[in-house]
Amino acid sequence: MNIGTPLSPVATRVMLLGSGELGKEVIIALQRLGVEVIAVDRYQNAPGHQVAHRAYAIDMTDPVALRELIDKENPHLIVPEIEALNTQLLAEVELAGHTRVVPTVKAVQLTMNREGIRRLAAEELKLPTSPYAFADSEQSLRTAIESGIGYPCFIKPTMSSSGKGQSRITSPEQIAAAWEYAATAGRVNQGKVIVEGQIDFDYEITLLTVRALDAEGKVETSFCEPIGHLQEKGDYVESWQPQPMTALALGRAQEIARAVTESLGGLGLFGVELFVKGDQVWFSEVSPRPHDTGMVTMGSQRFSEFDLHARAILGLPVNVALSRPGASAVIYGGLDSSQLVFEGVEQALAVPESDIRLFGKPESFARRRMGVALATADDVEKARARARTAAKLVKTRDGK
């Protein structure tokens, strides 16, 4: 892989579609390798905008606006970081030959909604998953639940992230509200939902899976140590690495992750979500990009998930080794403000082996993720305690 000088005619140009906190870290990782980065998001001053060479705010589902920007910037790589994209245009762009979509257009199209990836995993690859059905009306949702899925169950938009639009219901009386919430709260209103039966699992993990080129130029699949995480209302609030697992469960998790990522193809890092009970493992979801629970790797690994993604998409070798047990804990905005001020940062950083990342989002909401605390220790439990302590020490106030 040749890498040219940024801001010159020979620059290696990468365009990120989606420039939130995860995209911001990918941009920084790419720039450390001498790449010229163009950050795109739906709103101005997104976290990634603040560190990129150039930044744009457009509707990325609009094929005309997206085409104009791609033609203007002429990137070598396009790296989707969100689901709400016009993937048909991306397919046309990649077919033209000059620009490569990371990891592949197929991966982006299938993972942008839960129906595509669930049908691939369960029906084509025959991987174990929770019982599921798709519904395009309240009545068909009710029928799916009552004819086999049962209670409790989860209702989710076919296209959403960070828990948006998700509900857990335990009775027929909750179906109408869950349908309305899921059908309208996703990234794009699809008018369709997935209903999943509840699995009796011990814990859930994210297995960061990297497809990269080895020294001979062959695609090699590597696995980071499993990441455990705690969720509230479908959104991650805490993660840790490594998550203890039996050798058999870990092997099965890696087999599932390998099967899914090989089918999706391309180069890059994938966040594969799995449920685990004893030695049993079920596939849940996959993201063809760094995962929010993987932010723990900024402290626990020699190369974070963002470094690994940057290296892999550029065709460079990767090292997935764990440096030290680590944990992350979310820092919330706590209030609605466009002038948020963080206090207590010095106290948070006084916690042993701690660090924080403040994302720089231009607008805060009470439950919006505005930062993350990181910590390492001799063992995971101590790291988790340190990360939680550091996160709680960071306070917010309105600066107006």
Swiss-Prot record:
- Binding residues annotated for N(1)-(5-phospho-beta-D-ribosyl)glycinamide, in chain numbering: 21-22, 81, 292, 361, 368-369
User: Which Gene Ontology terms describe the biological processes this protein takes part in?
Assistant: 'de novo' IMP biosynthetic process
UniProt-listed Enzyme Commission number(s): 6.3.1.21
Q: Which GO terms describe its molecular function?
A: ATP binding; magnesium ion binding; phosphoribosylglycinamide formyltransferase 2 activity; phosphoribosylglycinamide formyltransferase activity
Q: Which domain of life is it from?
A: Bacteria
Q: Which Pfam families match?
A: ATP-grasp, PurT_C, RS_preATP-grasp-like
Task: Tell me which residues make up the ATP-grasp domain.
Answer: 119-314
Q: Which residues bind Mg(2+)?
A: 273, 285
Q: Can you state the subunit structure given in the record?
A: Homodimer.
Q: What does this protein do?
A: Involved in the de novo purine biosynthesis. Catalyzes the transfer of formate to 5-phospho-ribosyl-glycinamide (GAR), producing 5-phospho-ribosyl-N-formylglycinamide (FGAR). Formate is provided by PurU via hydrolysis of 10-formyl-tetrahydrofolate.
Q: What is this protein called?
A: Formate-dependent phosphoribosylglycinamide formyltransferase
What phylogenetic lineage does the species belong to? Bacteria, Pseudomonadati, Pseudomonadota, Betaproteobacteria, Nitrosomonadales
